[in-house]
Amino acid sequence: MESAITLWQFLLQLLLDQKHEHLICWTSNDGEFKLLKAEEVAKLWGLRKNKTNMNYDKLSRALRYYYDKNIIKKVIGQKFVYKFVSFPEILKMDPHAVEISRESLLLQDSDCKASPEGREAHKHGLAALRSTSRNEYIHSGLYSSFTINSLQNPPDAFKAIKTEKLEEPPEDSPPVEEVRTVIRFVTNKTDKHVTRPVVSLPSTSEAAAASAFLASSVSAKISSLMLPNAASISSASPFSSRSPSLSPNSPLPSEHRSLFLEAACHDSDSLEPLNLSSGSKTKSPSLPPKAKKPKGLEISAPPLVLSGTDIGSIALNSPALPSGSLTPAFFTAQTPNGLLLTPSPLLSSIHFWSSLSPVAPLSPARLQGPSTLFQFPTLLNGHMPVPIPSLDRAASPVLLSSNSQKS
């Protein structure tokens, strides 16, 4: 016998051979057979396959392989009884073709017998089986759950974030408005009264530079309002003493030579030129009389007392001096009755008593004589000579104040 024979072929040969009727026999005409001596049949199968330890248990497990191939099946309720499924066709078929084409033949027969509804149900069953296997694969842990979550639920999370970002700007908008109001307040659009800081310096040279800086640091906006009024200044007015203690005849020691500066802030709509004189103050006759302000409304800075005998030059960028970026700028000019304080937006172009000035040799720091002519650089319409009388005398303090009161 051939060694390449299969188990079902081996059993079929035993049934067809009359010598082995005491081991295996047919029980019916439809292909049922019974193993009369199952252990002997198993030993014969072991001899064919060169397996000496073959027994019925191993033989029965080998027969189960043909259950799936639908070649042999076990008869239920009968021990050692089996049946060939396609009998007697199996006797006429090629043994090699039986195992290869048996499964395909069974599928074709089932398709022919099944109705169209059954076919559709079979297809749906296959689709459900595929989806079930996919879900089992996803939840088995072999597939990353992070990737599944990121693919299934990202749009909702992004929408929530976008709505939160759209709701946040209205809540933050009030602080932005508050910052804008602060900026408007700094630019003095709504503030009517501004107090000017006052700096006290020990030497006369620093005092001269400080007074010049304070006199020249006024904003261009206030100066533009005061330019029309500056043209209507007259030069005839009587002198009147403002303070008895500051009269030119009052003697003072040399170390107490001082310059008193009194600055009062006015509204931007009611500003007018100021007259300055040594020890006296007058009001221009061309200007209408102005009522005296109450004491509660007067905002004046403490006087700046500057002592010394020598008037020199000082750098305007000293940290002791106030910044002039947001302060008005006034300029002094000579009138027959005294010194007139006129506005001028020359904050960054005027050089006071510096070596860069074209009239530096004529500065009071180098010419100490009385009635020294001192010229500033080009002003509104030309050069304005300003005499500074009695700078070297001991009893000639100057009081600079606003014309808020009548002389």
From Swiss-Prot:
Domain of life: Eukaryota
One Gene Ontology biological process: regulation of transcription by RNA polymerase II
DNA-binding region: 5-85
Compartments (UniProt record): Nucleus
Motif interval(s): CTBP-binding motif: 273-277
InterPro entries xrefs: Ets_dom, ETS_fam, WH-like_DNA-bd_sf, WH_DNA-bd_sf
Crosslink site: Glycyl lysine isopeptide (Lys-Gly) (interchain with G-Cter in SUMO2): K92, K165
Assigned keywords, A-Z: Activator, DNA-binding, Isopeptide bond, Nucleus, Phosphoprotein, Repressor, Transcription, Transcription regulation, Ubl conjugation
A GO molecular function held by the record: DNA-binding transcription activator activity, RNA polymerase II-specific
Region (Disordered): 234-253, 271-298
Gene Ontology cellular component list: chromatin; mitochondrion; nucleoplasm; nucleus
Coiled coil residues, start to end: none
Annotated positions of the Phosphoserine modification: S115, S396
Pfam family, one: Ets
Entries under SMART domains matching the protein: ETS
Complex formation: Interacts with CTBP1.
Membership in a protein family: Belongs to the ETS family.
PANTHER family in alphabetical order: ETS, ETS DOMAIN-CONTAINING PROTEIN ELK-3
Described function: May be a negative regulator of transcription, but can activate transcription when coexpressed with Ras, Src or Mos. Forms a ternary complex with the serum response factor and the ETS and SRF motifs of the Fos serum response element.
UniProt-recorded name of the protein: ETS domain-containing protein Elk-3
Species annotation: Homo sapiens
